[in-house]
């Protein structure tokens, strides 16, 4: 029998080398850096870096949407106006740091002399952080990145996007629905884009009893950037902000 930290190993489960040997023997294989215990340390390091970087950020709103949205389009300009409006209202603007909607929101924040944050993600196709990110961090793991989005945001603004945008939207909806975060406005921008999805939610999910009657009301849908900002400001005016740590 051998004790290995808090674990007990017996028989063939006992490794042929000690932890110190594997650390100090440079002739050993290098694939240990890809093992799960090492990944735990990398994951921990990402949390520490994210929490440390944004610990003193102050009130912030995350803006999500497609990386494929072209400059000069209505959606891009709307995201830029939302970013500027949020910054003028005293919020830092957090995005995924990429192009499209993310770039537009960061650009708007910078134009209004606000704080512009980008939380990037390692992808097979390198994108990098857009030029309007002033505070940036690149993550390896989606779930760490999503935790940082939630922890340092007081609201989510969601413009038209694809699977990644939907992932972030439903992550927030689940946390609000289950009471893990409170007083956390979720505003969808673009009634034409989102109305079909929420009609399906009302018909299929609510209609079959899979969600509560109040659950579809967890989100607001708006088209005007000024209204988006007003919804968030009004939601926070009467009490403490959710997601502030």
Regions picked out by a protein language model, each given a short descriptive name:
Residues 188-245:
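C-terminal functional extensions of proteins
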Residues 2-20, 25-119:
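Glycine-rich beta-alpha loop segments
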Residues 100-158:
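Acidic/glycine-enriched connector segments
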Residues 54-56, 85-87, 109-110, 127-131, ...:
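Solvent-exposed alpha-helices and their adjacent loops that cap or buttress functional pockets
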Residues 123-128, 165, 193-196:
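Short gly/pro/ser/thr-enriched loop/turn and capping motifs at secondary-structure boundaries
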Residues 33-40, 185-186, 190-193:
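Catalytic-core regions of core metabolic enzymes
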Residues 140-192, 236-241:
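Active-site/ligand-binding-proximal alpha/beta "capping" segment
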